[in-house]
Amino acid sequence: MAKEKYDRSKPHVNIGTIGHVDHGKTTLTAAITTVLARRLPSSVNQPKDYASIDAAPEERERGITINTAHVEYETATRHYAHIDAPGHADYVKNMITGAAQMDGAILVVASTDGPMPQTREHILLSRQVGVKHLIVFMNKVDLVDDEELLELVEMEIRDLLSEYDFPGDDLPVIQGSALKALEGDTKFEDIIMELMDTVDSYIPEPERDTDKPLLLPVEDVFSITGRGTVASGRIDRGTVRVNDEIEIVGIKEETKKAVVTGVEMFRKQLDEGLAGDNVGILLRGVQRDEIERGQVIAKPSSINPHTKFKGEVYILSKDEGGRHTPFFNNYRPQFYFRTTDVTGSIELPAGTEMVMPGDNVTINVELIHPIAVEQGTTFSIREGGRTVGSGIVSEIEA
């Protein structure tokens, strides 16, 4: 475990890059770290090249980013954890777990292409998982000679954002070239600094739910020989300290109690983890097979596992990439809660024979495994790897 203390003097914000495959998300992430390391050198600001962000071996073989890369950097006023969210449609599931961790995001659109299918999909996902603030980076402007074409692409992006209830007319659009900035072109480096100034000012410092009871959705689990089991994820709300008693809730039949013996972030030890932090939690008396992704670590008795609830859902239209046909009573899709999919059956309200793509409806859901849910928990409805709806738990039934 890490020895160095983590510096809390600057406010911490989680952001990420989203957008269509090959539009330059990873190159922009590399450019931000590299330009900040040149302009604002510090122990945090270390340049990361494309290959190191695109690190997992299977990613390079296909030239597409699969896993979610985490990098950190700081501006004069803030510390950032940056997620490079995968752009390819096959990896939307990973995108959902990544986007759920963002206070705001940079939507990368290649000026040479304009908005593409995954641009739309990622805007929709951002809306669904509660990413409220988007900034647009129009990339590859060095490859477009026609000023009018750039204006058209910008208008198209703004219209698309408005369609999904983002303030398309007002949100910032920055035009630049991530590759040119990475290569050290001063003009394009300046634009990266302008982008970061915009991120500093436009994405509000998140309201942290530190006063609420602890809830940490488990993303990953590993064991450290001689120390015990570590669960990692982003603290949704509350705080966690060494010696805290916690419960591991969901999926398994029984809720398990445990004690926290260590908290760390970016390989540095913390006195406490706060809402919004990406942390690893060392747990005493928990075997590696007793905790898994999809469960939550919570303050004892603060949240319970449930299989039945009422939900308000919106079913995506065909144009939004949803189903082409209606569904009927006892439809069995996957319900995506926080970090995992669980199959469930849908019971429609009395008198409703079917639900059409584009409809809003109140449904009763019964899951095959209990999940830690409460009123206000959000979820996506998915089938065959694609999102077909989104919803929010309105009432717990059992």
Curated annotation (Swiss-Prot):
Write the lineage as a comma-separated list: Bacteria, Bacillati, Bacillota, Bacilli, Lactobacillales
Name the chain's protein. Elongation factor Tu
Q: Which InterPro entries match?
A: EF-Tu_GTP-bd, EF-Tu_GTPase, EFTu-like_2, EFTU_2, G_TR_CS, P-loop_NTPase, Small_GTP-bd, T_Tr_GTP-bd_dom
User: How does this chain assemble?
Assistant: Monomer.
What GO cellular-component annotations does this UniProt entry give?
Answer: cytosol
Cell location: Cytoplasm
Which residues does GTP bind?
A: 19-26, 84-88, 139-142
The superkingdom listed in its UniProt entry is Bacteria
Q: Tell me the segments the record calls region G5.
A: 177-179
Q: Where is this region: G1?
A: 19-26
Q: Which gene encodes it?
A: tuf
**Xref: PROSITE patterns:** G_TR_1, G_TR_2
Reactions listed under catalytic activity: GTP + H2O = GDP + phosphate + H(+)
The UniProt entry's sequence similarity note says: Belongs to the TRAFAC class translation factor GTPase superfamily. Classic translation factor GTPase family. EF-Tu/EF-1A subfamily.
Domain tr-type G, first and last residues per copy: 10-207
Organism of origin is: Streptococcus pyogenes serotype M1
Q: Which UniProt keywords are listed?
A: Cytoplasm, Elongation factor, GTP-binding, Hydrolase, Magnesium, Metal-binding, Nucleotide-binding, Protein biosynthesis
Question: Where do the record's region annotations for G2 lie?
Answer: 63-67
